[in-house]
């Protein structure tokens, strides 16, 4: 069937039959998966390959047998061509887009703030239709941003990701509603194009069929039919079966086509004089001209499918036809009449039913390629206007394609998209998983999509058609819930933009290994069994009745012979992050959602450690995320150093792989690569050569395996607080490196050029000790807040220099100039070690913004040990803040003296229903201790042979929905290997007797003990803690600024004032509202009194009161301030002089550019 072939086109590009050299993980999986997980970045890379029409994409398309598929750029140029002038005597057409080599490497672009782009050229052909002369030229169309291998773009030196957008597909949508007054069934239909006017038909409560063109006033539908050239007799013949159509025809007063056209014109263009020709042109332009109306291929496909027209023919034509309109009206009339099926014009029987707009058969993805293509289309249509104007103004003889074309609009449109579009986002590089998830994200927001405020509950809710396409778990908490999702593991996008998911074909009750990809609406026509349905060795179902999903309805038991398809994998319905949660099936969905989201917030630690309890997804996720170095050709490792790995391939070629060393990610985390192969080692193609951040031996490793006890401890772990052992601090178990980038530029000012120098006024040599002769801090220097990183001076002066003065300065040098210190200092609250410096200068021909002569970047790395107030989390949504760090000797310990690392409260489990964390703890202990199954117990009958025995420190995989069962856990806990003393610490129930580290007494009850995987999250207390004594004030209100970034104060708000009033603390309140806030004169006087040891003076009038007065006066209200005896008080401006005098005496700087530190403010 043609339709099925067209839909199932995209293939798995990276067929990874298993990654060579991968670490061993013992798996509890019982179900064999016939299909490998597809390339996880294909969503991005395939779409971009289609856009640029790369040779690899063409090869894959040819191999699939796709006919007439053109690349995205070609498609747009074909649409645009030819551009004709207003008389039609000249035309310009474009073809053959091609790219030259990219201008600079990815690393160079990142370093120099450039865009990773390739020059785009097209062939432009100018034809003079009068003389038949043809001029052809290759035209440069601007630099086109290229996608990196990792599915990202580098724009102005920063890595960005274009998120795929979920939108309603063009097509016809039938809807049902009930009239509130009469309680009658009403039906309506909308024909929604990709671009152009909407066409709506409806049946109202008076049983007449109406039409709305382009959302204007309603008219009888027969007016439109007559305007399209149908006579009353033809309408009666076609719709004679329908009473409501006949009654509509009777009520329609228009006589013939001309009258109908004029009637429509009056509704669409009220106030304009109607003529038959203009009305005819208007109607044709609205729906039947490709320039104005475009259903797109997908819209045409959806209409053909819904209405049953042109079935089995190729999808062609992107405008409406008269047949479409008539068939749509017939479908609506039959729907209203309650018919269940209808015979389409081609003789095909189609079901008559209303549409569900939230169904994934009606929602499609606009992937990267299409989003950029739409933007280019906008740019080209702007260019088209320019070309037309130039055709009419320029001399015909002198015209060449180059003189007609202005590429500025195209370049600007592309730049605008990558720089400012809601869908072009700053890449989340917190860890490899967060980057991978970001590239697989699906957003319903953005231009042409929904807005947060308008989106209702139905759009956000989980829909049955999401199964295997969009993850029901992973979505943000908060206003975007349900509007942003994540692509499921096995899902892929077909050329129409619909998401497909794979199924195994079932023939006569026998499951085959043939895999078919189905879209959501195709899937609804079949019966689908679950992946865990019991199947015998011959592929036949073991049970007569199988639990299946039929259509969009509930589950039901069906005879084995009726089953059409079966899921390929139990993890088919979830996304990558969700598939990395072990025992997901035992967690409540709300907590699983938090677990999936919090894995993306884990910071890379100094030493990564893969989880003891994984799900088998870790390896593929890490390799596809692209932060590990993967070998390209099989061969032997020739040389290994910290910076390079060189591989001599079997075909005699050499390849050196460069490691990234301590680079800063977009989120300020540290990205570092470390080789994991040795010299002389044999490596295969696809093998991991070096670990990146958060990976160990090529597996995703976001946190640490810690020995956990689940018990309350003196109330210190109340309300999700966590107690940690001092060992984790001392041994840097949870220590991470954070790198901050500080930037300063030297510009030309009106008073002269700024200068980067070591010669800074009023600064001691002590402060300059770490600066080199240029005035830039040396690499390796330890710096803390307030230290100078780059010395810079700016000319100071009230007036511009006269030409004479400038001449004298030029002759005698600039010694006499007044300069002020504008050095780059370490911001408040930060410290660390300088690890890198980049200097860009106009003298070295670096590309700098206008007016900038020199730019210096300083990278400061900070090692952050774990501390009270940091946030930790497990993978099951079990998060908490560190409440106390205990000395190791005070921690509870096991009978063999091993102290636990972390104590979690028992109260965090029952109400939240994330039991997965308990099972993970038990299985973690089993993996750490190792096991050996004795005899032939009943619980072990489903375990594979290799699972009956495992050494200590074994890593385990328990895939989602197909993992270790409860009885297997209990059995294995009883089969764990004893420790060196021959004792088993933990009982069959997973509990151990713990001893109190302080007293040595055992705790009264056994405690659940085991190994849990704990992540350190990005919410670190160092980034949040903040204090201020003196600092900047707002210019208008003269009150302190707010927030850590502005070095602001704490707002003493309305409710806090009430509290003071309640206590009757009048003087304290007055002080808070005046001299501690915005009584400008009072502030200085109080400071003076404190310095001189005098009594605190009376407060004055707060600045905000003066602002209020001025605002009221600006509304033309004559407001005066009266004293207690009724005399008007003049609020003098002269107070400023007293203020300046007092400030000068005390040496206080009252200018806007406050010094960066408290010490400087006080000096």
UniProtKB/Swiss-Prot annotation:
Keyword Cytoplasm recorded: no
Catalytic activity: RNA(n) + a ribonucleoside 5'-triphosphate = RNA(n+1) + diphosphate
Swiss-Prot/TrEMBL GO biological process terms: DNA-templated transcription
Matches recorded under InterPro entries: DNA-dir_RNA_pol_bsu_ext_1_sf, DNA-dir_RNA_pol_bsu_external_1, DNA-dir_RNA_pol_su2, DNA-dir_RNAP_su2_dom, DNA-dir_RNAP_su2_hyb_sf, RNA_pol_bsu_bac, RNA_pol_bsu_CS, RNA_pol_bsu_protrusion
Pfam families found in the cross-reference section: RNA_pol_Rpb2_1, RNA_pol_Rpb2_2, RNA_pol_Rpb2_3, RNA_pol_Rpb2_45, RNA_pol_Rpb2_6, RNA_pol_Rpb2_7
Keywords tagged on the record: DNA-directed RNA polymerase, Nucleotidyltransferase, Transcription, Transferase
EC number: 2.7.7.6
Tagged with keyword Electron transport: no
GO cellular component, one term: DNA-directed RNA polymerase complex
Example GO molecular function: DNA binding
Coiled coil spans: none
Enzyme class label: transferase
NCBIfam families membership: PRK00405.1, rpoB
HAMAP family xref list: RNApol_bact_RpoB
Function of the protein: DNA-dependent RNA polymerase catalyzes the transcription of DNA into RNA using the four ribonucleoside triphosphates as substrates.
Family: Belongs to the RNA polymerase beta chain family.
Subunit structure: The RNAP catalytic core consists of 2 alpha, 1 beta, 1 beta' and 1 omega subunit. When a sigma factor is associated with the core the holoenzyme is formed, which can initiate transcription.
Protein name per the record: DNA-directed RNA polymerase subunit beta 2
